[in-house]
Amino acid sequence: MELVFIRHGQSEWNAKNLFTGWRDVKLSEQGLAEAAAAGKKLKENGYEFDIAFTSVLTRAIKTCNIVLEESDQLFVPQIKTWRLNERHYGRLQGLDKKQTAEQYGDEQVRIWRRSYDTLPPLLDKDDEFSAHKDRRYAHLPADVIPDGENLQVTLERVLPFWEDQIAPAILSGKRVLVAAHGNSLRALAKHIEGISDEDIMGLEIPTGQPLVYKLDDNLKVIEKFYL
């Protein structure tokens, strides 16, 4: 069995080195090109999908659409879920990473970005950019909508969707594409690869590059590689 992850192509805020999180940012021109190249590469290597899962953020949805279109598979059903959203960076969202490091120190920013269990400063619920005010989350209970997350909380959010939707799809024989975000994919990778809390800090998933997992019948990783 195989599973393919793809992190969305470069976003406009990736290009500007800003914290993005749940802010809905478009793909940059480079990001659009990365998604198209990924779709072509998947087609060239014979990858076909039966279902695709993505987040409710534009940059991931757009990447998923482009990948499927470029691989002549735009007909493949897509399921969009907030559970595959990027990690919520709290009050850091929209801030310049370099300027934030100058203010708080490189080590503090590294911990906020990469540690497993350290939360960022939380966003106020009445902030104009709070997810509580975004209608795409209107169906969710208020206490479920995050104001800031670490990777541990992100995994706790993503894992129920893995167990309820993604894993059963794979086990039923479906060929699955997951088009999501750096940290939601890091969380899934931690789970399926059994990566330790310490080692996950060093895991980077590049934008727009298909990551293939070969899995056994228990969804244990046999092999992983980038196309």
From Swiss-Prot:
SMART domains the record matches:
PGAM (SM00855)
Taxonomic superkingdom: Bacteria
Q: Kindly list the positions annotated as binding substrate.
A: 7-14, 20-21, 59, 86-89, 97, 113-114, 182-183
The record's section on Pfam families has: His_Phos_1
Record has Isomerase as a keyword = yes
Designated name of the protein: 2,3-bisphosphoglycerate-dependent phosphoglycerate mutase
- Metabolic or biological pathway, per its Swiss-Prot or TrEMBL entry: Carbohydrate degradation; glycolysis; pyruvate from D-glyceraldehyde 3-phosphate: step 3/5
**Family assignment from sequence similarity:** Belongs to the phosphoglycerate mutase family. BPG-dependent PGAM subfamily.
**Catalytic activity annotated for this protein?**
(2R)-2-phosphoglycerate = (2R)-3-phosphoglycerate
Gene symbol here is gpmA
Give its E.C. classification number: 5.4.2.11
Subunit description: Homodimer.
> What keywords does the record list, in alphabetical order?
Gluconeogenesis, Glycolysis, Isomerase
Annotated site, Transition state stabilizer, chain positions:
H181
Gene3D superfamilies, sorted? Phosphoglycerate mutase-like (3.40.50.1240)
Q: Does the keyword Isomerase apply?
A: yes
NCBIfam families, sorted: pgm_1 (TIGR01258), PRK14115.1 (NF010713), PRK14118.1 (NF010716)
Q: Which PANTHER family match?
A: PHOSPHOGLYCERATE MUTASE
A Gene Ontology biological process noted in the UniProt record is:
glycolytic process
- Which InterPro entries does this UniProt record tie to the protein? His_Pase_superF_clade-1, His_PPase_superfam, Phosphogly_mut1
Catalytic-site annotation from UniProt: H8, E86
Please explain the role this protein plays, according to its UniProt record: Catalyzes the interconversion of 2-phosphoglycerate and 3-phosphoglycerate.
Molecular function GO labels: phosphoglycerate mutase activity
SUPFAM superfamilies from the UniProt entry? Phosphoglycerate mutase-like
Q: Which organism is it from?
A: Neisseria meningitidis serogroup A / serotype 4A (strain DSM 15465 / Z2491)
